[in-house]
Amino acid sequence: MSTDLRSRVLTEHNVSRETAQALDLYVAQLTRWQTVKNLVGPATLSEVWQRHVADALQLLTIAPEARRWLDLGSGAGIPGLILAIAGRGRSGFHVELVESNARKCAFLSETARLTGAPVTVHNARIEAVIGHRSGIDIVCARALAPLTQLLAWSEPLLTSGTVGLFPKGRDAAAELTEAEDAWTFTRDLIPSRTDSQARIVRVTSLSRVDP
């Protein structure tokens, strides 16, 4: 079953043989490290190609021209490390991964080295990194925090032309309503290709609501 899912995901996203091999390495690494460090929900490993790989790859279809990405709370490298693996052959493509947990950073660094993924791993808190970044096309985060908090962390970038892409589950609309109490922004709710109840929130032109 997982082989069928793998083939379908690779076909849908027009993945080259070399990139497919690198994604196989990522999945093998994730499976190996999962035994010592709980990187993803154990029940999701059997559906890793749909739940994690395809879920990350769909962001490239939303922002195909983006070259510089910043992934907040990277954890198991979803979506950031997967995006970097898929973008290896693109000129200037680079993903910065921000993760405060040292063991997870070890996983990210080792897997990036094995797959040749163009990444920089920041073993630091988001607040210590994000204010010093510039030239970022996309800031993203999955399963990290409510949208209001993601916007607060991303404010230095989203007020300077960067686009936010934040995958959300069935509570996306409620999180948007809460965020709009504190922030003004342009947004799109993009249906997820991997979960009919999920959405990807695209955010631009962020500013704070006047008190």
From Swiss-Prot:
Sorted UniProt keywords: Cytoplasm, Methyltransferase, rRNA processing, S-adenosyl-L-methionine, Transferase
Residues the record lists as binding S-adenosyl-L-methionine: 73, 126-127, 142
HAMAP family with a match to the protein in the record: 16SrRNA_methyltr_G (MF_00074)
GO cellular component: cytosol
Keyword Repeat: no
Entry's Gene Ontology molecular function annotations: rRNA (guanine-N7-)-methyltransferase activity
Name of the protein in its database record: Ribosomal RNA small subunit methyltransferase G
Organism: Methylorubrum populi (strain ATCC BAA-705 / NCIMB 13946 / BJ001) (Methylobacterium populi)
Function per UniProt: Specifically methylates the N7 position of guanine in position 527 of 16S rRNA.
Subcellular localization: Cytoplasm
Xref: InterPro entries: rRNA_ssu_MeTfrase_G, SAM-dependent_MTases_sf
Cited NCBIfam families: rsmG_gidB (TIGR00138)
Chief place where the protein resides: cytoplasm
Catalysed conversion reaction: guanosine(527) in 16S rRNA + S-adenosyl-L-methionine = N(7)-methylguanosine(527) in 16S rRNA + S-adenosyl-L-homocysteine
Enzyme Commission (EC) number: 2.1.1.170
Family: Belongs to the methyltransferase superfamily. RNA methyltransferase RsmG family.
